Amino acid sequence: MCELCQTMDLTCLYVCVRIQIKGGAVIMCTAACFKDKDCYFGKNLDYEFSYGEQIVVTPRNFEYGFRYTDEPSYKYAIIGMAHVSDGYPLYYDAMNEKGLGMAGLNFVGNAYFNPVVKNKTNVCSFEFILWILFQCETVEEAIHLINEMNLCDTPFSASFPPASLHYMISDSNKTITVESVKQKSIKTYKKRQT
């Protein structure tokens, strides 16, 4: 029995929900990862309008052009939901060919991204999903990269400022939430083991 929902006969790993009401419109994201004999990862985007999102496949070794850091030497293929601007996939959520999934969820009023920091791996918030999924097979590998990086506040463009997000990262064995908040920098939360 799932300790979170008390109804499903599955081993739930994590559920992350964030709701914000603006002018009568409900803006919400829900992400979930659970497993029985298989592992399931998914997210919805409950907006009353579209940003032009589409299913996007980014092939192995795609040259993304990260703003402040070198390209990883090898990059996994990725599929997910993204808005494409100037040839760059701005992923909302995605999964790589190794089965590592990642979703960005609303965190308005709480998300804080830092200015660029010298002598640190600086990854822009809009690059974060690609940065992790290009080079990690597991949540543990993602945690290692996250501990070495600065999630910075550089906008993609004048039309696309940093989105106020926190993130869920999941593989078949583990799920974490990643939050970049003021005074704590990047914090990871693991699902409590039972």
What are these regions (language model features)?
Residues 27-121, 148, 153:
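A contiguous strand-loop segment
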Residues 5-6, 11-27:
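Short, Lys/Arg-enriched N-terminal segments with co-localized hydrophobic residues
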Residues 38, 125-126, 139:
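Alpha-helix initiation and N-capping motif
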